[in-house]
């Protein structure tokens, strides 16, 4: 692991390996490294960070453990987008001690502070704060992206890439941008397993996946999020994306009283407004099918023509209420002059 981190560090310009090396050459970086990254994030492959620190001390001869340097190398390899932030160095220092590589990678996904203000805790009276939501109740929790759009809710990309930066405000659902590729499923499944096994680790990743599963119910929901810049689909097929989120959140419990619960309640209150339901019903009935739209426009056009014709007829009647009959003229016959004998 340490050699992989060293060779793939962009700040190291000289690498003492042959270009054709199957592991550390150009071929390895292109064809082998993606699978190495995936294996580094598997829960059963985790090595305690303490072991990596000891090996680093033996290699460099340092007397003290340098969490920042080792954490930086790991994040550069596994989450390079995080390093594009100008304040990434300070955020890496805030990560502190980590149990292993997967723990550090998880922190890099949620280290950025969300753009929404932290809501005050709202304990529910008469209910336990640890009451869990079952994935089977999904239809009763949050509607799909199509249904939310019909109710007037818009989707926008959050200002940060933190997976805990999702919120709902004034009819807009803010979600962090997410790139989907062949390694996405392995990554999230291991992160969810880590949060469920380790007490006190948090449930930020689980809450995000649970939310995305509620929004993405079928392949028709995926283009809505893609057009908003929320989903970057490298899988190619919308059906595969929908199946991915629907399978990852099966039988996942999420604690009540967290940020996900607040977003859910705000969205439900917004969708329960009467005129929102009328708008959703109108769009669902008349604007789903293009032929239905054409029929509706034609009906409105004919109705408008009928009203105009009625107004014109009534107006003519009131302008000439008692029209005077025109005088009749007696028929005239031609007179032929008489001839004198």
Regions found by a protein language model. Name each.
Residues 279-317:
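Alpha-helical transmembrane segments and their immediate juxtamembrane boundary regions
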């Amino acid at each position: 692991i340490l050699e992989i981190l060293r060779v793939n560090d962009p700040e190291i310009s000289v690498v003492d390996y042959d270009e054709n090396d199957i592991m550390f050459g150009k071929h390895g970086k292109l064809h082998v490294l993606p699978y190495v990254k995936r294996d580094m994030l598997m829960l059963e492959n985790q090595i305690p960070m303490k072991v990596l620190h000891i090996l680093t001390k033996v290699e460099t001869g340092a007397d003290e453990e340098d969490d920042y340097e080792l954490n930086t190398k790991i994040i550069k390899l596994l989450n390079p987008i995080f390093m594009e932030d100008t304040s990434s160095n300070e955020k890496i220092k805030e990560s502190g001690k980590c149990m292993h590589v997967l723990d550090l990678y998880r922190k890099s996904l949620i280290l950025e502070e969300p753009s929404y203000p932290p809501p005050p805790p709202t304990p529910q009276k008469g209910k336990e704060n640890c009451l869990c939501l079952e994935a089977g109740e999904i239809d009763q929790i949050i509607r799909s992206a199509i249904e939310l759009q019909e109710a007037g809710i818009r989707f926008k990309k959050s200002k940060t890439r933190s997976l805990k930066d999702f919120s709902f405000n004034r009819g807009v659902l803010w979600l962090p941008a997410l790139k989907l590729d062949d390694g996405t499923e392995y990554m999230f499944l291991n992160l969810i397993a880590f949060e469920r096994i380790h007490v006190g680790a948090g449930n930020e990743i689980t809450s995000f996946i649970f939310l995305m599963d509620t929004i993405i119910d079928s392949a028709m929901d995926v283009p809505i999020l893609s057009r908003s810049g929320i989903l970057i689909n490298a899988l190619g097929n919308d059906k595969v994306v929908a199946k991915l989120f629907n399978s990852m959140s099966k039988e996942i419990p999420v604690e009540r009283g967290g940020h996900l619960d607040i977003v859910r309640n705000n969205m439900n209150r917004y969708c329960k407004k009467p005129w929102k339901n009328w708008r959703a019903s109108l769009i669902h009935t008349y604007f789903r099918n293009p032929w239905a739209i054409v029929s509706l426009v034609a009906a409105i056009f004919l109705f408008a023509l009928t009203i105009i014709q009625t107004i014109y007829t009534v107006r003519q009647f009131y302008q000439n209420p008692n029209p005077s009959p025109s005088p009749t003229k007696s028929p005239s016959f031609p007179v032929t002059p008489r001839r004198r004998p």
